[in-house]
């Protein structure tokens, strides 16, 4: 999994906090007890290349929404947390017209209407380097590549999670975003 990002030292990096109300609206399709993304921030460089658009999030899973407490972060929770940080990243990029491949087809109303049926996971690979504390952890989401076709936009992404200790999980996900 190649996800190392080289930043041109001439580019300035801007970090902005994503409003919690915006996060809440994007995560509205989730039941309250399964909204694991608590806070998010967005960073971008002057280049505005899709690879420079990165979201960081703070997560907490007080109790699993589907199983007794396993005591650790697992593949199902990876997928749910990935979806949540991905949706917030995508919504922020559409709102601010940062990714033309998406902004050409979607505005915010269309995104909210189509986020569940039109954002598909085509491929997901995740790995767990060490046990991650699901009660409080952090995630980073970014884009490796984008390819737009007439019916679909394919987005190759990465998403990594870590806790305050040694807990680590990494993954790469290919999305297929259908044209509305």
Regions found by a protein language model. Name each.
Residues 58-62, 129, 176-178:
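A structural detector for beta-sheet-dominated domains
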Residues 38-48, 124-129, 141-146:
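Short amphipathic beta-strand and strand-loop transition segments with alternating hydrophobic
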Residues 30, 86-93, 161:
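Hydrophobic, Leu/Ile/Phe/Ala-enriched alpha-helical segments that form helix-helix packing faces
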Residues 91-138:
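Hydrophobic beta-strand-centered segment that forms part of the acyl-chain substrate-binding groove
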Residues 1-76:
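Non-catalytic linker/capping segments at the edges of enzyme domains
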Residues 2-22, 131-180:
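HotDog/MaoC-like acyl-thioester-processing domains
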Residues 71-89:
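A short mixed-secondary-structure module that forms the rim of ligand-binding clefts
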Residues 48-50, 114-121, 164-166:
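A generic structural signal for short, non-catalytic loop/turn and secondary-structure boundary residues
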């Amino acid at each position: 999994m190649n996800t190392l990002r080289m930043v041109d030292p001439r580019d300035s990096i801007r970090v902005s906090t994503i409003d919690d109300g915006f996060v809440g609206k994007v995560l509205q399709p989730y039941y309250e007890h399964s909204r694991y993304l608590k806070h998010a921030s967005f960073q971008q460089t002057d280049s505005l290349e899709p690879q420079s658009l990165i979201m960081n999030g703070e997560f907490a899973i007080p109790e699993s929404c589907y199983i007794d407490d396993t005591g650790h972060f697992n593949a199902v929770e990876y997928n749910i947390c990935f979806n949540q940080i991905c949706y917030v990243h995508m919504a922020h990029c559409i709102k601010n017209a940062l990714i033309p491949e998406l902004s050409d087809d979607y505005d915010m109303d269309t995104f909210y209407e189509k986020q569940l049926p039109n954002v598909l996971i085509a491929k997901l690979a995740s790995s767990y380097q060490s046990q991650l504390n699901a009660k409080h952890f952090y995630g980073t989401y970014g884009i490796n590549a984008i390819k737009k076709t007439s019916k679909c936009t394919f987005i190759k992404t990465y998403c990594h999670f870590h806790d305050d200790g040694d807990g680590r999980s990494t993954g790469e996900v290919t999305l297929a975003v259908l044209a509305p």
